[in-house]
Amino acid sequence: MKGVGIDLPQQDFIDMKDAGIEVISTEWGMEQRVGMARAFLDQAQSAGLKVIMDGGFSSRAWGFTDSDWQRLPEGKRPVWQKERVQGWINALKDHPAIYAWDISNEFGENLPSGAGAGCPDWPNSRITIEQLKQARADVLEADPTRPIHARMYGGDKGEFPDHVKAMLDNKIADIISLNLYSNYLANNKLQWPTVIADAGAFFVNAIKKRQPEVKVWMSISAFEYPKQFQRTTAASLERDIDEAVKIQELDGVSFFCWGPVDQWDMKSDWYLPKSGPDLWTVIKNKIKN
């Protein structure tokens, strides 16, 4: 389960575990206090859950400040913060609930220098492959015991863009979360509601062809974000899950998101148990069956 908020009751963790969820991840990271992060990890550990933690996907890991979201200085680009990242990892790595370290969300598209923030320099302000190679090396230097996780999305059905090919060829990640959200909107229209049925297997197989040993988890939409993502329906969620599990090369399925998400690039009061109880029921039933 992705996008799990930092300040939740223990029952949420218990409910996820009881439903069959094994691993959770967050949208928050190094902007939070270490004490808060450890408390979250304690909750997960108590419920028997593992956590994918920020190891470099957050804006702080790339040298950005809160004010950059409101007004990015002209020409400011991502700069990897080795000391900050390794300090964060060293403060948390002894916790047994940590499953992996997440070093990238869509090549920085969701950073202040990214397309999601309306940066006019995009895609020139994209995180580079050399930076991701350095990020991987530095995270593994601090904690060589856990795998590296990265997030990416599929484009049009066809060749991957060069930066995605380079990520796979350089084995940046040990686990890839492939974000295929069928509820994506543009101009108030769903753009590709059948993306998983149409191209899910293609994307997974293309990833495995370039990096055979990588684990691929498909991330499926179970949320709403006004003007960008239409509320997932129970029917579309059932369809997406059914199509995903047909893909033989797929190693796992995840869902975005539990919520709430309160980050600079995405503020949402979406909270799956209350905002999408019908979707949570679908997820639980599908895992059970």
Where are these regions (language model features)?
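Aromatic-lined substrate-binding rim segments of carbohydrate-active enzymes
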Residues: 9-69, 120-150, 168-169, 190-205, ...
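Aromatic-lined carbohydrate-recognition surfaces of secreted/lumenal glycan-active proteins
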Residues: 54-56, 100-102, 125-164, 178, ...
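Active-site mouth loops of central-metabolism enzymes
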Residues: 1-8, 69-79, 149-150, 154-155, ...
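Surface-exposed, active-site-proximal loop segments in enzymatic domains
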Residues: 59-79, 109-120, 266-271
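Short, acidic/polar
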Residues: 4-18, 80-91, 156-169, 232-245
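Substrate-binding cleft of secreted/luminal carbohydrate-active enzymes
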Residues: 99, 215-288
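Active-site groove signature of glycoside hydrolases
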Residues: 72, 82-126, 171, 178-180, ...
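Glycoside hydrolase catalytic-domain groove-lining segments
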Residues: 12, 147, 156-228, 271-279, ...
